Protein backbone atom coordinates (compact mmCIF):
# COMPACT_ATOMS: atom_id res chain seq x y z
CA UNK A 1 0.00 0.00 0.00
CA UNK A 2 1.26 3.47 -1.03
CA UNK A 3 2.29 5.81 1.60
CA UNK A 4 0.93 9.31 1.97
CA UNK A 5 4.10 10.86 0.58
CA UNK A 6 4.04 8.61 -2.47
CA UNK A 7 0.43 9.46 -3.19
CA UNK A 8 1.16 13.18 -2.81
CA UNK A 9 4.06 13.00 -5.28
CA UNK A 10 1.93 11.09 -7.77
CA UNK A 11 -0.85 13.67 -7.50
CA UNK A 12 1.64 16.46 -8.14
CA UNK A 13 2.89 14.68 -11.27
CA UNK A 14 -0.66 14.23 -12.51
CA UNK A 15 -1.42 17.92 -11.85
CA UNK A 16 1.68 19.02 -13.81
CA UNK A 17 0.74 16.71 -16.67
CA UNK A 18 -2.76 18.15 -16.63
CA UNK A 19 -1.36 21.70 -16.79
CA UNK A 20 0.73 20.76 -19.81
CA UNK A 21 -2.29 19.28 -21.53
CA UNK A 22 -4.30 22.43 -20.78
CA UNK A 23 -1.57 24.67 -22.23
CA UNK A 24 -1.35 22.50 -25.32
CA UNK A 25 -5.11 22.65 -25.81
CA UNK A 26 -5.07 26.43 -25.45
CA UNK A 27 -2.26 26.75 -28.02
CA UNK A 28 -4.07 24.43 -30.39
CA UNK A 29 -7.27 26.44 -29.95
CA UNK A 30 -5.44 29.71 -30.77
CA UNK A 31 -3.93 28.18 -33.87
CA UNK A 32 -7.32 26.85 -34.94
CA UNK A 33 -8.87 30.31 -34.48
CA UNK A 34 -6.05 31.92 -36.50
CA UNK A 35 -6.38 29.35 -39.27
CA UNK A 36 -10.12 29.89 -39.33
CA UNK A 37 -9.59 33.67 -39.63
CA UNK A 38 -7.09 33.18 -42.44
CA UNK A 39 -9.51 30.84 -44.18
CA UNK A 40 -12.26 33.43 -43.89
CA UNK A 41 -9.99 36.17 -45.28
CA UNK A 42 -9.00 34.00 -48.21
CA UNK A 43 -12.64 33.33 -48.88
CA UNK A 44 -13.67 37.01 -48.72
CA UNK A 45 -14.65 38.55 -52.04
CA UNK A 46 -11.96 40.97 -53.35
CA UNK A 47 -12.27 44.74 -52.84
CA UNK A 48 -11.92 47.04 -55.82
CA UNK A 49 -10.93 50.67 -56.35
CA UNK A 50 -12.72 53.51 -58.10
CA UNK A 51 -12.13 57.18 -58.88
CA UNK A 52 -14.41 59.71 -57.23
CA UNK A 53 -16.25 61.99 -59.69
CA UNK A 54 -18.92 63.92 -57.79
CA UNK A 55 -21.35 63.82 -54.89
CA UNK A 56 -25.01 63.06 -55.53
CA UNK A 57 -28.14 63.18 -53.40
CA UNK A 58 -27.83 62.03 -49.81
CA UNK A 59 -24.86 59.77 -49.23
CA UNK A 60 -24.50 58.45 -52.76
CA UNK A 61 -21.63 59.39 -55.06
CA UNK A 62 -20.65 58.94 -58.69
CA UNK A 63 -17.44 56.98 -59.31
CA UNK A 64 -15.59 55.60 -62.29
CA UNK A 65 -15.07 51.87 -61.85
CA UNK A 66 -13.29 49.82 -64.52
CA UNK A 67 -14.27 52.30 -67.20
CA UNK A 68 -17.91 52.39 -66.11
CA UNK A 69 -19.61 55.27 -64.36
CA UNK A 70 -21.48 54.00 -61.29
CA UNK A 71 -23.58 55.57 -58.55
CA UNK A 72 -22.69 53.82 -55.30
CA UNK A 73 -23.54 54.01 -51.61
CA UNK A 74 -21.01 55.08 -49.01
CA UNK A 75 -20.06 53.85 -45.56
CA UNK A 76 -20.95 56.03 -42.60
CA UNK A 77 -17.25 56.36 -41.70
CA UNK A 78 -16.38 57.97 -45.07
CA UNK A 79 -16.07 61.78 -44.89
CA UNK A 80 -17.81 62.94 -48.07
CA UNK A 81 -17.01 66.63 -47.53
CA UNK A 82 -13.28 66.00 -47.83
CA UNK A 83 -13.52 64.21 -51.19
CA UNK A 84 -12.45 66.03 -54.35
CA UNK A 85 -12.73 64.87 -57.98
CA UNK A 86 -9.95 62.43 -58.73
CA UNK A 87 -9.77 60.96 -55.21
CA UNK A 88 -9.20 57.20 -54.99
CA UNK A 89 -11.82 55.10 -53.10
CA UNK A 90 -11.93 51.47 -51.92
CA UNK A 91 -15.16 49.59 -52.68
CA UNK A 92 -16.35 46.47 -50.83
CA UNK A 93 -17.94 43.40 -52.38
CA UNK A 94 -21.25 45.25 -52.58
CA UNK A 95 -19.55 48.13 -54.47
CA UNK A 96 -20.07 50.51 -51.58
CA UNK A 97 -17.35 53.09 -50.94
CA UNK A 98 -15.82 52.35 -47.55
CA UNK A 99 -12.46 54.18 -47.48
CA UNK A 100 -10.44 56.93 -49.18
CA UNK A 101 -6.93 55.84 -50.18
CA UNK A 102 -3.92 57.83 -51.50
CA UNK A 103 -4.41 58.76 -55.17
CA UNK A 104 -2.37 57.27 -57.97
CA UNK A 105 0.90 59.07 -58.80
CA UNK A 106 1.43 57.38 -62.17
CA UNK A 107 -0.11 57.88 -65.57
CA UNK A 108 0.45 59.55 -68.92
CA UNK A 109 2.31 62.87 -69.24
CA UNK A 110 0.83 65.02 -72.02
CA UNK A 111 1.04 68.70 -73.05
CA UNK A 112 -1.83 71.13 -72.59
CA UNK A 113 -3.16 72.47 -75.89
CA UNK A 114 -5.75 74.87 -74.52
CA UNK A 115 -7.43 75.72 -71.22
CA UNK A 116 -11.19 75.85 -71.83
CA UNK A 117 -13.47 78.37 -70.13
CA UNK A 118 -15.32 75.77 -68.03
CA UNK A 119 -12.10 74.58 -66.33
CA UNK A 120 -11.71 71.64 -68.69
CA UNK A 121 -8.44 71.12 -70.55
CA UNK A 122 -7.70 70.25 -74.16
CA UNK A 123 -4.63 67.98 -74.17
CA UNK A 124 -2.66 66.24 -76.92
CA UNK A 125 -2.45 62.56 -76.04
CA UNK A 126 -0.74 61.80 -79.36
CA UNK A 127 0.08 63.79 -82.51
CA UNK A 128 -3.30 62.82 -83.98
CA UNK A 129 -5.25 62.36 -80.73
CA UNK A 130 -6.55 65.41 -78.86
CA UNK A 131 -8.92 64.95 -75.92
CA UNK A 132 -10.92 67.08 -73.48
CA UNK A 133 -10.32 66.10 -69.84
CA UNK A 134 -11.60 67.33 -66.51
CA UNK A 135 -9.39 68.71 -63.77
CA UNK A 136 -8.84 66.84 -60.53
CA UNK A 137 -9.62 68.71 -57.32
CA UNK A 138 -6.01 69.74 -56.73
CA UNK A 139 -5.93 71.58 -60.09
CA UNK A 140 -9.24 73.41 -59.80
CA UNK A 141 -7.68 76.78 -59.03
CA UNK A 142 -4.27 76.33 -60.69
CA UNK A 143 -3.68 78.33 -63.86
CA UNK A 144 -2.45 76.12 -66.70
CA UNK A 145 -1.10 77.41 -69.99
CA UNK A 146 -0.63 75.87 -73.44
CA UNK A 147 2.58 73.87 -73.41
CA UNK A 148 2.42 72.95 -69.72
CA UNK A 149 2.82 69.24 -69.11
CA UNK A 150 0.27 67.44 -66.92
CA UNK A 151 -0.21 63.95 -65.51
CA UNK A 152 -3.49 62.42 -66.71
CA UNK A 153 -5.50 59.27 -66.07
CA UNK A 154 -7.05 58.49 -69.42
CA UNK A 155 -9.40 55.87 -67.97
CA UNK A 156 -11.02 58.34 -65.58
CA UNK A 157 -10.52 61.23 -68.05
CA UNK A 158 -8.98 63.39 -65.33
CA UNK A 159 -5.94 65.66 -65.19
CA UNK A 160 -4.24 64.79 -61.91
CA UNK A 161 -1.33 67.19 -61.48
CA UNK A 162 1.07 69.55 -63.22
CA UNK A 163 4.48 68.17 -64.14
CA UNK A 164 7.56 70.38 -64.45
CA UNK A 165 9.84 68.93 -67.10
CA UNK A 166 13.42 70.11 -66.64
CA UNK A 167 14.39 69.70 -70.29
CA UNK A 168 11.67 72.20 -71.25
CA UNK A 169 11.72 74.68 -68.37
CA UNK A 170 15.51 75.02 -68.62
CA UNK A 171 15.20 76.35 -72.16
CA UNK A 172 13.44 79.51 -71.03
CA UNK A 173 14.44 81.72 -68.10
CA UNK A 174 11.50 83.95 -67.23
CA UNK A 175 13.01 85.86 -64.30
CA UNK A 176 14.25 89.34 -65.16
CA UNK A 177 18.05 89.44 -64.59
CA UNK A 178 19.52 91.85 -62.07
CA UNK A 179 21.99 93.47 -64.49
CA UNK A 180 22.20 97.24 -64.90
CA UNK A 181 23.85 99.23 -67.68
CA UNK A 182 26.39 100.69 -65.26
CA UNK A 183 27.74 97.17 -64.75
CA UNK A 184 28.78 97.05 -68.42
CA UNK A 185 32.01 98.79 -69.29
CA UNK A 186 33.33 100.10 -72.59
CA UNK A 187 30.07 99.90 -74.57
CA UNK A 188 28.64 103.38 -74.13
CA UNK A 189 27.71 103.89 -77.80
CA UNK A 190 26.06 100.50 -78.11
CA UNK A 191 24.13 100.99 -74.88
CA UNK A 192 22.88 104.39 -76.01
CA UNK A 193 21.78 102.94 -79.36
CA UNK A 194 19.85 100.07 -77.84
CA UNK A 195 18.23 102.32 -75.22
CA UNK A 196 17.01 104.59 -78.00
CA UNK A 197 15.70 101.56 -79.89
CA UNK A 198 14.03 99.78 -76.98
CA UNK A 199 13.36 102.00 -73.97
CA UNK A 200 12.24 105.16 -75.76
CA UNK A 201 9.38 103.54 -77.76
CA UNK A 202 8.14 101.72 -74.66
CA UNK A 203 8.24 104.74 -72.35
CA UNK A 204 6.93 107.25 -74.93
CA UNK A 205 4.23 105.20 -76.65
CA UNK A 206 1.81 108.14 -77.02
CA UNK A 207 4.51 110.35 -78.53
CA UNK A 208 5.43 107.61 -81.00
CA UNK A 209 1.80 107.29 -82.05
CA UNK A 210 1.59 111.06 -82.54
CA UNK A 211 4.47 110.95 -85.00
CA UNK A 212 3.27 107.74 -86.63
CA UNK A 213 6.37 105.85 -85.53
CA UNK A 214 6.34 102.09 -85.10
CA UNK A 215 8.52 100.63 -82.34
CA UNK A 216 11.16 98.21 -83.60
CA UNK A 217 10.16 94.57 -83.42
CA UNK A 218 13.66 93.32 -82.75
CA UNK A 219 17.34 94.07 -82.24
CA UNK A 220 20.34 92.08 -83.44
CA UNK A 221 23.51 92.30 -81.36
CA UNK A 222 26.45 90.89 -83.29
CA UNK A 223 30.17 90.81 -82.82
CA UNK A 224 33.03 88.69 -81.43
CA UNK A 225 32.44 86.35 -78.48
CA UNK A 226 32.78 87.64 -74.95
CA UNK A 227 32.17 91.32 -75.71
CA UNK A 228 28.95 91.88 -73.76
CA UNK A 229 26.06 91.01 -76.08
CA UNK A 230 24.27 88.86 -73.51
CA UNK A 231 24.88 91.38 -70.72
CA UNK A 232 23.35 94.16 -72.84
CA UNK A 233 20.22 92.06 -73.45
CA UNK A 234 19.87 91.34 -69.72
CA UNK A 235 20.39 95.01 -68.86
CA UNK A 236 17.70 96.01 -71.39
CA UNK A 237 15.17 93.78 -69.64
CA UNK A 238 16.16 95.09 -66.22
CA UNK A 239 16.02 98.76 -67.24
CA UNK A 240 12.65 98.26 -68.95
CA UNK A 241 11.23 96.96 -65.70
CA UNK A 242 12.59 99.91 -63.72
CA UNK A 243 11.28 102.46 -66.21
CA UNK A 244 7.94 100.65 -66.38
CA UNK A 245 7.62 100.88 -62.60
CA UNK A 246 8.27 104.63 -62.73
CA UNK A 247 5.78 105.28 -65.53
CA UNK A 248 2.99 103.18 -64.02
CA UNK A 249 3.61 104.27 -60.44
CA UNK A 250 4.02 100.72 -59.12
CA UNK A 251 6.71 99.19 -56.96
CA UNK A 252 9.80 97.68 -58.55
CA UNK A 253 9.00 94.33 -56.90
CA UNK A 254 5.56 94.25 -58.54
CA UNK A 255 7.02 95.21 -61.91
CA UNK A 256 9.68 92.50 -61.62
CA UNK A 257 7.03 89.90 -60.81
CA UNK A 258 4.85 90.76 -63.80
CA UNK A 259 7.59 91.32 -66.41
CA UNK A 260 9.55 88.59 -68.17
CA UNK A 261 12.91 87.93 -69.78
CA UNK A 262 12.52 84.86 -72.00
CA UNK A 263 16.08 83.66 -72.51
CA UNK A 264 15.93 81.07 -75.28
CA UNK A 265 19.05 78.92 -75.48
CA UNK A 266 19.33 78.35 -79.20
CA UNK A 267 21.25 75.05 -79.45
CA UNK A 268 19.20 73.41 -76.68
CA UNK A 269 15.96 74.27 -78.46
CA UNK A 270 16.87 72.03 -81.38
CA UNK A 271 15.11 68.67 -81.39
CA UNK A 272 15.61 65.71 -83.70
CA UNK A 273 11.85 65.17 -84.00
CA UNK A 274 10.18 67.09 -86.79
CA UNK A 275 8.00 69.90 -85.49
CA UNK A 276 9.23 69.88 -81.89
CA UNK A 277 11.53 72.89 -82.29
CA UNK A 278 8.77 74.82 -84.05
CA UNK A 279 6.38 73.93 -81.22
CA UNK A 280 8.87 75.21 -78.64
CA UNK A 281 9.20 78.50 -80.52
CA UNK A 282 5.41 78.86 -80.56
CA UNK A 283 5.28 78.27 -76.81
CA UNK A 284 7.91 80.95 -76.19
CA UNK A 285 5.90 83.54 -78.09
CA UNK A 286 2.66 82.40 -76.43
CA UNK A 287 4.24 83.11 -73.05
CA UNK A 288 5.37 86.50 -74.33
CA UNK A 289 1.88 87.38 -75.59
CA UNK A 290 0.36 86.33 -72.29
CA UNK A 291 2.68 88.63 -70.30
CA UNK A 292 2.44 91.50 -72.79
CA UNK A 293 -1.36 91.37 -72.90
CA UNK A 294 -1.35 92.72 -69.33
CA UNK A 295 0.74 95.70 -70.51
CA UNK A 296 4.00 94.44 -69.03
CA UNK A 297 7.37 94.62 -70.84
CA UNK A 298 8.64 91.32 -72.25
CA UNK A 299 12.06 90.64 -73.76
CA UNK A 300 12.61 87.50 -75.85
CA UNK A 301 16.35 86.87 -76.12
CA UNK A 302 17.71 84.35 -78.63
CA UNK A 303 21.34 83.57 -77.82
CA UNK A 304 23.54 81.96 -80.50
CA UNK A 305 20.89 82.90 -83.05
CA UNK A 306 22.75 81.38 -86.00
CA UNK A 307 22.32 77.92 -84.46
CA UNK A 308 18.54 78.08 -84.94
CA UNK A 309 17.87 80.47 -87.78
CA UNK A 310 20.52 79.67 -90.36
CA UNK A 311 20.03 80.75 -93.97
CA UNK A 312 17.64 78.32 -95.61
CA UNK A 313 19.20 75.88 -98.03
CA UNK A 314 22.63 75.85 -96.36
CA UNK A 315 22.12 72.71 -94.25
CA UNK A 316 24.54 69.86 -94.89
CA UNK A 317 22.80 66.91 -93.25
CA UNK A 318 19.26 68.25 -92.92
CA UNK A 319 17.36 71.40 -93.75
CA UNK A 320 15.60 71.93 -90.43
CA UNK A 321 15.96 75.68 -90.95
CA UNK A 322 13.43 75.49 -93.80
CA UNK A 323 10.66 75.10 -91.20
CA UNK A 324 12.22 76.78 -88.14
CA UNK A 325 12.92 80.10 -89.88
CA UNK A 326 9.35 80.48 -91.25
CA UNK A 327 8.00 79.71 -87.77
CA UNK A 328 10.01 82.58 -86.26
CA UNK A 329 9.01 84.91 -89.09
CA UNK A 330 5.34 84.13 -88.50
CA UNK A 331 5.70 84.71 -84.76
CA UNK A 332 7.56 88.02 -85.14
CA UNK A 333 4.99 89.26 -87.63
CA UNK A 334 2.29 88.18 -85.20
CA UNK A 335 3.81 90.27 -82.44
CA UNK A 336 3.43 93.48 -84.45
CA UNK A 337 0.25 94.41 -82.60
CA UNK A 338 1.90 94.11 -79.17
CA UNK A 339 3.80 97.18 -78.05
CA UNK A 340 5.42 95.52 -75.06
CA UNK A 341 7.35 92.69 -76.74
CA UNK A 342 10.88 93.11 -78.06
CA UNK A 343 12.96 90.36 -79.67
CA UNK A 344 16.72 90.55 -79.14
CA UNK A 345 19.08 88.21 -80.95
CA UNK A 346 22.79 87.70 -80.32
CA UNK A 347 25.24 86.12 -82.73
CA UNK A 348 28.93 86.06 -83.61
CA UNK A 349 28.14 84.72 -87.09
CA UNK A 350 25.60 87.22 -88.36
CA UNK A 351 26.45 86.21 -91.94
CA UNK A 352 24.81 82.80 -91.31
CA UNK A 353 21.42 84.17 -90.21
CA UNK A 354 18.63 84.01 -92.78
CA UNK A 355 18.22 87.43 -94.51
CA UNK A 356 14.44 87.34 -94.09
CA UNK A 357 14.90 87.64 -90.32
CA UNK A 358 17.18 90.67 -90.64
CA UNK A 359 14.95 92.77 -92.88
CA UNK A 360 13.24 95.93 -91.52
CA UNK A 361 10.01 95.09 -89.73
CA UNK A 362 11.52 92.10 -87.97
CA UNK A 363 14.98 92.70 -86.50
CA UNK A 364 14.93 96.40 -87.35
CA UNK A 365 18.01 97.50 -85.40
CA UNK A 366 21.45 95.98 -85.92
CA UNK A 367 24.10 96.91 -83.37
CA UNK A 368 27.68 95.76 -83.73
CA UNK A 369 29.38 95.11 -80.40
CA UNK A 370 33.07 95.67 -81.08
CA UNK A 371 36.09 94.58 -79.12
CA UNK A 372 37.08 97.11 -76.44
CA UNK A 373 39.83 99.59 -77.31
CA UNK A 374 42.35 100.92 -74.80
CA UNK A 375 39.96 103.36 -73.13
CA UNK A 376 37.11 100.84 -72.99
CA UNK A 377 39.45 98.10 -71.81
CA UNK A 378 40.68 100.21 -68.92
CA UNK A 379 37.07 100.96 -67.98
CA UNK A 380 36.23 97.26 -67.93
CA UNK A 381 39.31 96.48 -65.83
CA UNK A 382 38.15 99.11 -63.35
CA UNK A 383 34.81 97.35 -62.91
CA UNK A 384 36.52 94.21 -61.63
CA UNK A 385 39.52 95.81 -59.87
CA UNK A 386 37.29 98.23 -57.96
CA UNK A 387 37.65 99.93 -54.60
CA UNK A 388 36.49 96.82 -52.76
CA UNK A 389 39.58 94.87 -53.90
CA UNK A 390 42.70 95.43 -51.74
CA UNK A 391 45.74 96.63 -53.70
CA UNK A 392 49.35 97.32 -52.76
CA UNK A 393 49.92 100.30 -55.08
CA UNK A 394 47.80 103.11 -56.43
CA UNK A 395 44.69 101.63 -58.05
CA UNK A 396 44.62 104.03 -60.99
CA UNK A 397 48.27 103.36 -61.79
CA UNK A 398 47.64 99.61 -61.64
CA UNK A 399 44.82 99.99 -64.14
CA UNK A 400 47.03 102.10 -66.42
CA UNK A 401 49.77 99.47 -66.24
CA UNK A 402 47.41 96.59 -67.03
CA UNK A 403 45.86 98.47 -69.96
CA UNK A 404 49.29 99.29 -71.44
CA UNK A 405 50.48 95.70 -71.10
CA UNK A 406 47.34 94.28 -72.71
CA UNK A 407 47.20 96.78 -75.58
CA UNK A 408 50.92 96.73 -76.34
CA UNK A 409 51.72 96.97 -80.08
CA UNK A 410 55.38 95.96 -79.97
CA UNK A 411 56.66 92.99 -82.02
CA UNK A 412 56.83 90.97 -78.82
CA UNK A 413 53.03 91.02 -78.60
CA UNK A 414 52.44 89.68 -82.13
CA UNK A 415 49.81 86.94 -82.08
CA UNK A 416 49.00 85.76 -85.63
CA UNK A 417 49.74 86.63 -89.22
CA UNK A 418 46.66 86.63 -91.44
CA UNK A 419 47.23 85.98 -95.14
CA UNK A 420 44.56 87.09 -97.61
CA UNK A 421 43.64 85.74 -101.02
CA UNK A 422 44.73 88.98 -102.72
CA UNK A 423 48.31 88.42 -101.57
CA UNK A 424 48.22 90.86 -98.66
CA UNK A 425 48.81 90.01 -95.04
CA UNK A 426 48.37 91.55 -91.59
CA UNK A 427 50.17 90.93 -88.34
CA UNK A 428 47.72 91.03 -85.48
CA UNK A 429 48.60 91.50 -81.83
CA UNK A 430 46.94 90.22 -78.69
CA UNK A 431 45.13 93.53 -78.36
CA UNK A 432 43.17 92.68 -81.51
CA UNK A 433 41.60 89.67 -79.73
CA UNK A 434 40.87 91.15 -76.32
CA UNK A 435 37.26 90.91 -75.11
CA UNK A 436 35.45 91.89 -71.96
CA UNK A 437 35.55 88.26 -70.85
CA UNK A 438 39.33 88.22 -71.39
CA UNK A 439 39.79 91.32 -69.24
CA UNK A 440 37.69 89.91 -66.44
CA UNK A 441 39.65 86.67 -66.54
CA UNK A 442 42.93 88.58 -66.29
CA UNK A 443 41.76 90.42 -63.17
CA UNK A 444 40.49 87.16 -61.65
CA UNK A 445 43.88 85.55 -62.27
CA UNK A 446 45.62 88.47 -60.57
CA UNK A 447 43.29 88.18 -57.57
CA UNK A 448 44.06 84.46 -57.22
CA UNK A 449 47.79 85.20 -57.33
CA UNK A 450 47.29 87.83 -54.63
CA UNK A 451 45.44 85.30 -52.45
CA UNK A 452 48.24 82.75 -52.80
CA UNK A 453 50.84 85.44 -52.12
CA UNK A 454 49.03 86.55 -48.97
CA UNK A 455 48.89 82.97 -47.68
CA UNK A 456 52.62 82.53 -48.34
CA UNK A 457 54.04 85.90 -47.27
CA UNK A 458 51.26 87.70 -45.44
CA UNK A 459 51.31 90.68 -47.82
CA UNK A 460 47.81 91.89 -48.64
CA UNK A 461 46.54 93.19 -51.97
CA UNK A 462 46.95 92.92 -55.73
CA UNK A 463 50.35 94.08 -56.94
CA UNK A 464 51.67 95.11 -60.35
CA UNK A 465 53.53 91.82 -60.70
CA UNK A 466 50.32 89.89 -60.15
CA UNK A 467 48.76 91.72 -63.09
CA UNK A 468 51.83 91.13 -65.28
CA UNK A 469 51.84 87.41 -64.48
CA UNK A 470 48.09 87.17 -65.09
CA UNK A 471 48.39 88.89 -68.49
CA UNK A 472 51.29 86.66 -69.51
CA UNK A 473 49.43 83.49 -68.49
CA UNK A 474 46.26 84.57 -70.29
CA UNK A 475 48.09 85.27 -73.53
CA UNK A 476 50.24 82.13 -73.38
CA UNK A 477 47.16 79.95 -72.92
CA UNK A 478 45.61 81.45 -76.06
CA UNK A 479 48.64 81.06 -78.33
CA UNK A 480 47.42 77.75 -79.75
CA UNK A 481 43.79 78.82 -80.16
CA UNK A 482 43.90 80.21 -83.75
CA UNK A 483 42.53 77.66 -86.22
CA UNK A 484 44.77 77.04 -89.20
CA UNK A 485 42.42 74.35 -90.54
CA UNK A 486 39.45 76.69 -91.12
CA UNK A 487 40.95 80.19 -91.26
CA UNK A 488 37.95 81.89 -92.88
CA UNK A 489 35.46 80.66 -90.28
CA UNK A 490 37.83 81.43 -87.43
CA UNK A 491 38.41 84.94 -88.76
CA UNK A 492 34.67 85.66 -88.97
CA UNK A 493 33.92 84.39 -85.48
CA UNK A 494 36.89 86.30 -84.05
CA UNK A 495 35.79 89.52 -85.75
CA UNK A 496 39.08 90.17 -87.53
CA UNK A 497 39.51 93.51 -89.29
CA UNK A 498 38.65 93.19 -92.94
CA UNK A 499 36.68 89.99 -92.35
CA UNK A 500 34.02 89.63 -95.02
CA UNK A 501 35.74 92.07 -97.40
CA UNK A 502 38.77 89.92 -98.16
CA UNK A 503 39.00 86.17 -98.10
CA UNK A 504 41.32 84.78 -95.42
CA UNK A 505 43.55 82.06 -96.84
CA UNK A 506 45.72 81.26 -93.83
CA UNK A 507 46.16 82.06 -90.15
CA UNK A 508 49.74 81.59 -88.93
CA UNK A 509 50.25 81.63 -85.12
CA UNK A 510 53.33 83.57 -84.02
CA UNK A 511 55.60 83.31 -81.00
CA UNK A 512 54.33 84.32 -77.57
CA UNK A 513 55.34 87.61 -76.05
CA UNK A 514 57.64 88.65 -73.23
CA UNK A 515 56.45 91.56 -71.12
CA UNK A 516 59.04 94.29 -70.90
CA UNK A 517 56.95 97.30 -69.92
CA UNK A 518 58.73 99.43 -67.26
CA UNK A 519 57.46 99.74 -63.72
CA UNK A 520 54.61 102.06 -62.81
CA UNK A 521 56.75 104.86 -61.49
CA UNK A 522 58.83 105.18 -64.65
CA UNK A 523 56.08 104.96 -67.24
CA UNK A 524 54.09 107.83 -68.66
CA UNK A 525 50.45 107.56 -69.54
CA UNK A 526 49.81 105.76 -72.81
CA UNK A 527 47.60 106.91 -75.67
CA UNK A 528 43.95 106.03 -75.77
CA UNK A 529 43.56 104.74 -79.29
CA UNK A 530 43.02 101.00 -79.51
CA UNK A 531 42.12 98.25 -81.91
CA UNK A 532 38.47 97.89 -82.85
CA UNK A 533 38.66 94.56 -84.57
Curated annotation (Swiss-Prot):
Keyword field: ATP-binding, Coiled coil, Nucleotide-binding
Keyword Oxidoreductase: no
Stretches assigned to coiled coil: 1-42
Pfam families: AAA, Prot_ATP_ID_OB_C, Prot_ATP_ID_OB_N
One record GO biological process: modification-dependent protein catabolic process
UniProt keyword Nucleotide-binding, yes or no: yes
Residue sites binding ATP per the record: 226-231
GO cellular component, one term: proteasome complex
Gene Ontology MF annotations: ATP binding; ATP hydrolysis activity
Summary of subunit composition and partner proteins: Homohexamer. Assembles into a hexameric ring structure.
Record-stated family: Belongs to the AAA ATPase family.
NCBIfam families: pup_AAA
Protein name according to UniProt: AAA ATPase forming ring-shaped complexes
Taxonomic source organism: Brachybacterium faecium (strain ATCC 43885 / DSM 4810 / JCM 11609 / LMG 19847 / NBRC 14762 / NCIMB 9860 / 6-10)
Amino acid sequence: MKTYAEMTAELEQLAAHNDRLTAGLRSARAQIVELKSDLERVGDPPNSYATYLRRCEGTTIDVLHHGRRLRVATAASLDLDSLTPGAELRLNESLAAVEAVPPSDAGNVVPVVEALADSRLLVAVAPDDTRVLRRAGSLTTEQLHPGDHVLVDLKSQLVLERIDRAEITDLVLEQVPDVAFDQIGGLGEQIEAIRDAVELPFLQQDLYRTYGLRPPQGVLLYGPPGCGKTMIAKAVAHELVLRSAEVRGVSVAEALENSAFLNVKGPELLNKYVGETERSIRLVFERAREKAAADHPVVIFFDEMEALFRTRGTGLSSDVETTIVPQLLAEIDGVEGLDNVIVIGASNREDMIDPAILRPGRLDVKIRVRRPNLRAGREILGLYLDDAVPVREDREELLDLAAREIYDESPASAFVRVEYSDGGSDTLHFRDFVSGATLRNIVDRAKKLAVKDQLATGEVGVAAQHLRDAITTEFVENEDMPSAAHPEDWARVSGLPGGGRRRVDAVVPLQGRTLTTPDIAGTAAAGEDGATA
